[in-house]
């Protein structure tokens, strides 16, 4: 069982490696499923240790889903109280589509109340009916969070029909929601239930970019 010190040691080692490769800023998702919040404790310590040479921002990420775990919301709020910077979520991992939408509403309201950014693992699936990015764009506008919200992965857009996407992308752009594709991991994870042809599972980068959506590639 890993300790807080174990996580600190690995994270400091990685931070030094990142800086040696010319990286000056990192946004990382810290797991809040652990009731002891060991990862949160560790990465807040690391953030303070590297602040003079690495801009480190932490996302509170309950990867088991906000409504699948009774302690999820409490742990997320505790992590934010401790100093984690950004509100995260994973709506497509909830038990139902409606729970996924509800989780987006709850987490965006938390961010709005606290003046924080949002970074959601959103629609990381091959299911074209996973459309949580639409809800994320709506809540962004409803709560006045334009420019402060990011949808990560967005791989279901690879499988959506073009008619729906022609509506969706303008909504994303209108809301000022940013996109972070993670191509190296999604080319491995997506399409794993396919036979042939296999989907590559990449979101629609060119269409998003052409619509004015700010895009930054990530690594998962």
What name fits each language-model region?
Residues 1-9, 59-71, 91-98:
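Active-site mouth loops of central-metabolism enzymes
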Residues 38-50, 68-150, 154-178, 195-215:
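Histidine/acidic residue-rich metal-binding segments in metalloenzymes
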Residues 18, 178, 183-199:
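C-terminal helical cap
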Residues 53-55, 59-62, 153:
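Conserved SAM/AdoMet-binding glycine-rich loop
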Residues 23-29, 57-58, 119, 217-219:
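Short beta-strand segments at enzyme active-site cores
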Residues 29-34, 62-64, 94, 124-125:
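Conserved short loop/turn motifs at secondary-structure junctions
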Residues 59, 152, 180-183, 216-219:
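Short, conserved beta-strand edge motifs with alternating hydrophobic and charged residues
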Residues 1-29, 37-49, 74-81:
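Alpha-helical scaffold segments that flank or form the walls of functional sites
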